[in-house]
Amino acid sequence: MPPPAKEGGRKGPRERSGKSAPGTAQGEERAKGAPATEPPKPGWALTPQGLAAMLPAQRHRHLLFGDLLEDVGAAASTFPCGSVEPGYRMPDPRPWTQSLELPAERQNRLLGVLKAAEARGRVRALRLRYTRMRAEEIALLIQRQKSARAAIRLELFLPPQLKPARIPDPLDRQERRRVETILEENVDGTIFPR
């Protein structure tokens, strides 16, 4: 004898509240007896139209945390225990957000990015050319000095490279002080010039 229909209180599994997840119409197909070929989409899965209708902050939040909102039941039916690859993936949000932009605006933005990159390249080339010409000019000045001492002095005060590599000092502070005092000592009436 079949159990009597439940009145008022609890409803059966197929008679639960008439609410279904937005964007899914598979609940009615199952009630009519048609077998479901696809697993039901989770409640957080939106269509591109639903995503476009959201406020920007809501859309951003949904795209960031949408995969955390899965129902346990939907997850169990969507991801069977034996499968390694999930049956349903969160669609890539990039085409939805990019499709909201008009093609002309997108082309203008891309053109601006390309022009800025080209300008940066030109500025970099000019800077490199200037430093190379400066280094060549200083090297020529150093070569044309009358004495080696003058050439070394000029090279110290005008390095060919703008940022010469610093050679680390092998002496510590105490040793450096000792070397300076030795250089300034009187030896045979002559002072070593510093």
UniProtKB/Swiss-Prot annotation:
Domain of life: Eukaryota
Biased composition (Basic and acidic residues): 7-18
Segments traversing the membrane: none
Name of this protein: Protein LKAAEAR1
InterPro entries in alphabetical order: LKAAEAR1 (IPR029152)
Classification of source organism: Eukaryota, Metazoa, Chordata, Craniata, Vertebrata
Organism of this sequence: Homo sapiens
Region of interest (Disordered), residue spans: 1-45
